[in-house]
């Protein structure tokens, strides 16, 4: 039981963070495809972007508690590049900073044109994907042979696409309540969710098979 409690913050970090990241990936896909979102829809979308950001902030707090003493979090700078856990947190912090900057710039009305908004949201989504890969690599520990494979990363990416797309799709549909998402944008959101579910199932099945060997 003590071991479960000790690892709970890390599990919460990975789960909550992946959902927040996936929401930004879903929003980027919709923004890139849907070039005709009205000003009112964009304003609502920018306000609701606070939801995945809150997810990410909560996840980061969980990560700090996994360190044992949150006050020692500043010491992670000494292990950048040598500790998978540190690399994971640093990559996530970079993503979160970019996401917050994007959100604030959008709220200020500086991303009304489709081009700059699509590029900026794409950068945030790419940083999120890198962060998810780092999360998966943090679990690939030589001391635990079952985890020491790329399939853990596959699981994280699948969970990110599935959970994040559900959150991002909900936010997008709340933003464009007068006119539903264009068919192509809505189709891509659904495709991302199905792809995420498939990837998650494959990753889980392979790891389960490894356990049985």
Residue positions per predicted region:
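Residues within alpha-helical transmembrane segments of multi-pass membrane proteins, especially transporters
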Residues: 20, 24, 54, 61, ...
């Amino acid at each position: 039981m003590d071991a479960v409690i000790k690892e709970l913050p890390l599990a919460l970090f990975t789960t909550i963070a992946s959902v927040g990241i996936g929401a930004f990936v879903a929003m980027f896909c919709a923004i890139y495809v849907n070039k005709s979102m009205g000003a009112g829809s964009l304003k609502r979308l920018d306000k609701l972007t606070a939801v995945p950001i809150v997810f990410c902030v909560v996840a980061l707090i969980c990560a700090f508690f996994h360190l044992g003493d949150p006050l020692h979090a500043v010491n992670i700078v000494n292990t950048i590049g040598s500790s998978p856990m540190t690399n994971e947190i640093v990559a996530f912090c970079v993503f979160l900073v970019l996401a917050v900057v994007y959100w604030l710039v959008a709220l200020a009305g500086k991303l009304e044109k489709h081009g700059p908004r699509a590029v900026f949201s794409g950068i945030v989504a790419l940083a999120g994907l890198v962060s998810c890969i780092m999360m998966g690599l943090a679990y690939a520990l030589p001391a635990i042979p079952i985890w020491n494979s790329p399939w853990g990363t596959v699981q994280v990416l699948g969970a990110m696409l599935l959970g994040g797309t559900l959150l991002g799709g909900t936010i997008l549909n709340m933003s464009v309540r007068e006119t539903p998402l264009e068919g192509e944008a809505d189709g891509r959101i659904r495709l991302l969710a199905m792809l995420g579910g498939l990837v998650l199932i494959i990753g889980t099945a392979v790891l389960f098979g490894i356990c049985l060997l």
